[in-house]
Curated annotation (Swiss-Prot):
Protein name per the record: FLYWCH transcription factor 2
Stated role: Probable transcription factor. May bind to the promoters of target genes, including micro-RNA genes, in order to repress expression, and acting redundantly with flh-1 and flh-3.
Keyword annotations: Metal-binding, Zinc, Zinc-finger
Span list, region Disordered: 102-148
GO terms under biological process: negative regulation of DNA-templated transcription; nematode larval development
Domain of life: Eukaryota
Biased composition regions of type Low complexity, renumbered to the chain: 111-140
Pfam family, any one: FLYWCH
């Protein structure tokens, strides 16, 4: 029975209509379009007629070259060349064995597809596979990631940003997310994400709990020696959110339960109210007495009471209400700190005495009974010792020459350069007559003669500390 059906189907196949031959003369553009449309229709009709026979032969395993020989490929190639000369778009067909209908899938606008005959044949034969491939590939497309967004991880309490992979392909390099300010770097294993090396410590504090809350992840359970992926959050966006939240929290009003008056303020307010009530009562009593006195005086003077139609004059004096000046706790504290004149004088005298006692002794109190033009100084060698012994030296005249002569006699050396006062390591002032004339008796100096070109005198106080004035 199967053989009978196969013979019947084979005998019932209609012959393929011939392809419209290509004319020898070159037609105009309109004739080319009509020719291409007619050739296209005939190719589709021939393929549809061949489809049932080809499918049945493939199912029974009796497929042969018999049916393929019915198609004139020479005419097909000539027709496709005609399509290419008229610049028409190539087309592809999807042949469905079940529905036995053709469906137009896509059109390619590239000229290379229309100029090549093999490309059109390949599109027709592989149209079914391309549709299935496109459907399966759409479901397995990778997740879209925007450009210039690097992966971020949480490692050792900090947020790190991906930098690059090593040339050997076994390590990943990470940088601190504040890469413009912080130079910290880190290397991790590419498979286990374990930290294998740390370079350059961070120059900032670890992210605060408020900043970590943006990542919506519990970081307390994570191992500090591994890299844990986190969401990629823009740091400037995070800072704006935190700044706005801090401003809002500062602008919120204080709850009534949080407002508690200080004891001093409560007592002061109660006392002010009591004083105001007492003053008001006294003023009211005085006004009543004044009104009674005025009424008695009017009666004794014979003044008749006002009659109807006249304007009544009120003899009642209303009490004057004075607005109390409420003082703040700060004003009361300032007023309580004010001293009387006597207390201020005593405090001033004590402070003056203390300042005089604390003032460093820059000279030794001596009574000079010699010549008024000479001066008595106490000199010691500046040799870096902790204790210095000062010797009295008399300068005969208040000038530089006499001072150098006295120093040469004290040191036993000859001064071949200048003489300067050393106030610090950087400040040296040359000695001159106007400076020496203001000196008083008993001043202390350390003499340094290490540099022959410049001898230095360092003024010190009674404790051996250098002075910045003489």
């Amino acid at each position: 029975m199967v053989d009978t059906m196969m013979n019947t189907n084979t005998d019932g196949v209609t012959a393929v209509p011939p392809i419209f031959p290509l004319p020898s003369t070159t037609p105009n553009r309109n004739n080319n379009n009509e020719l291409a449309m007619l050739a296209q229709k005939q190719i589709v009709a021939g393929l549809l007629l061949q489809q049932p026979t080809i499918v049945q032969a493939a199912v029974n395993g009796t497929n042969s070259q018999k049916h393929l020989a019915d198609i004139d490929y020479t005419n097909v190639i000539q027709t496709l060349q005609a399509l290419g000369t008229t610049n028409l778009k190539a087309f592809s067909l999807l042949l469905d064995p079940q529905s036995q209908t053709s469906q137009l899938i896509s059109e390619d606008t590239r000229p290379s597809a229309s100029s090549s005959p093999s490309s059109t044949a390949t599109a027709v034969s592989n149209s079914g596979q391309s549709n299935a491939t496109s459907t399966s590939s759409s479901s397995t497309e990778p997740e879209y990631k925007p450009r210039n967004v690097r992966e971020k991880v949480y490692a050792d309490g900090y947020i790190m940003s991906f930098d690059k992979k090593s040339c050997c392909g076994t390590k990943e390099f990470w940088r601190c997310e504040r890469k413009n300010d912080c130079n910290a770097r880190m290397h991790s294993d590419i498979n286990t994400r374990e930290i294998v090396r740390k370079l350059h410590p961070h120059n900032h504090e670890k992210p605060s709990p408020e900043e970590l809350a943006f990542y919506e992840q519990d970081f307390s359970t994570l191992h500090p020696n591994y890299c844990h992926p986190v969401k990629s959050i823009n740091r400037s966006y995070m800072q704006r959110k935190l700044s706005r939240a801090s401003h809002v929290s500062q602008a919120l009003p204080i709850a009534p339960q949080q407002i508690k008056a200080e004891p001093m303020e409560v007592d002061t307010t109660n006392q002010t109210i009591q004083n105001f009530q007492q003053n008001n009562n006294l003023m009211l009593l005085a006004s009543i007495n004044a009104a009674a006195t005025a009424a008695a005086a009017a009666t004794s003077a014979g003044i008749s009471p006002p009659v109807v139609g006249q304007k009544r004059v009120s003899t009642t004096v209303m009490p004057i209400t004075l607005k109390s000046q409420r003082t703040t706790p700060k004003e009361e504290e300032d007023s309580s700190q004010l001293m009387s004149q006597e207390e201020f004088r005593i405090t001033y005298e004590l402070t003056k005495k203390l300042m005089e006692m604390m003032k460093p002794k820059t000279e030794i109190g001596v009574r000079w009974q010699g010549d008024e033009g000479s001066i008595l100084l106490f000199l010691s060698h500046d040799n870096g010792a902790e204790e210095n012994v000062f010797f009295p030296v008399v300068v005969m005249n208040r000038d530089e020459k006499s001072l150098i002569t006295a120093l040469e006699g004290f040191t036993g050396k000859r001064c071949e350069g200048k003489l300067a006062l050393c106030y610090s390591q950087r400040v040296n002032v040359l000695v001159h007559e106007a400076l020496i004339s203001n000196w008083t008796h008993g001043k202390l100096f350390l003499v340094n003669t290490d540099a022959p070109a410049l001898w230095r005198l360092t003024p010190v106080d009674a404790f051996g500390e250098p002075l910045n004035h003489v």
